């Protein structure tokens, strides 16, 4: 088994010059935080473990400020190859089931490290290290240098 297995849920025939990266009409990412103190065993490498208590409702307050079209410069990697930092986040869903916190992102395209940087910022909000207003200020700052710790 590969270190990071994937599952194919659906297949459709595509034209011969179809390019998976450039012709995709939608992408979905599911990111998971396991919020507990005991170490991960089976899930190690498949989820991000956070020991501090996380307030999911506080993180959800940030959703309206990030959905839609924005300049996501703050949340892009220095190695990002995208011509523009402007992307449209179609939806962000945050849910919790016991110790698991799920982040579901849907968009046509994402910047390099955009999802992990957003989740890192939302984690700061959930831990009460940042307020939802701090999150919005980070997005609006368009400053990759000051926020490199998010990646």
Spans of model-derived segments:
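Acidic/histidine-enriched alpha-helical segments
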Residues: 10-15, 79, 129-143
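Conserved small/polar residues in nucleotide/adenosyl-binding loops
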Residues: 148-151
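A hydrophobic, small-residue-rich beta->alpha segment in the mid-to-C-terminal subdomain
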Residues: 118-130, 134
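Glycine-rich phosphate/pyrophosphate-binding beta-alpha loops
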Residues: 109-112
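Residues within well-ordered alpha-helical secondary structure of globular protein domains
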Residues: 62-65, 121, 141
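Non-catalytic RNA-recognition surface used by pseudouridine synthases
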Residues: 4-106
């Amino acid at each position: 088994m590969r270190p990071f297995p994937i599952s194919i849920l659906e297949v459709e025939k595509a034209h011969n010059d179809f390019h998976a990266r450039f012709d995709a009409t939608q992408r979905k990412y599911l990111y998971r935080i396991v919020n507990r103190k005991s170490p991960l065993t089976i899930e190690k490498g498949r989820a991000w473990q956070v020991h501090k208590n996380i307030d999911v409702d506080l993180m959800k307050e940030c959703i309206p400020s990030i959905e839609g079209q924005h300049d996501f410069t703050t949340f892009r990697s220095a190695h990002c190859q995208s011509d523009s930092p402007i992307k449209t986040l179609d939806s962000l869903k945050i849910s919790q089931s016991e110790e698991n916190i799920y982040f579901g992102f849907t968009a046509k395209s994402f910047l390099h490290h955009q999802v992990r940087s957003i989740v890192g910022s939302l984690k700061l909000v959930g831990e009460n290290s940042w307020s939802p207003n701090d999150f919005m200020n980070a997005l609006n700052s368009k400053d990759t240098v000051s926020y490199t710790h998010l990646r």
